[in-house]
Amino acid sequence: DRIGLDTRISRKESFLLANDGLYLGRLSLNTSTPDSISNNENIYGSHFSSISFKNRYSIYGSPSSSLSPYNPNTLTPPVIYLRGEKIGCLSKNVNLTNRVDPDVLNEWMIISDYLISFPYRKIHKFPIVNWELMYLVGQMLMPSFKTTGVIVVSDNFFRHH
């Protein structure tokens, strides 16, 4: 990856960064984005890539690797940057704060996207929304989720709200 960390931060990008400094892909639900973790055809979203956290045989995806979010004991999981801010980590380690479980990352992004974008849409187009339920689901997906927590603005970037 040719773009440096400082550039990504100044652009307010949302991405994963391995604890050894390797860029692990853009946090995006868009499967067409070239560096999206949702694009199964690229090196960041492929289950076969040596630098994908989705590859259970790579150092970034193996349950036995200290750099993997799937290691339930790791203290060095991938870091989550949302809109250029370091907000937490991607990890199965339940003892870490501000963590998102890698198995529900897409769901977390989808729910977050709905929560943040709803106020900007025309309300009459949507059914009644149970905000308490949405908040509880957010808490389940990210235990540290709060009303001031991190939520997705769109499929390509996030924002604190």
Give names to the regions the model predicted.
Residues D1-H161:
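Repetitive, compositionally biased segments used for assembly/scaffolding
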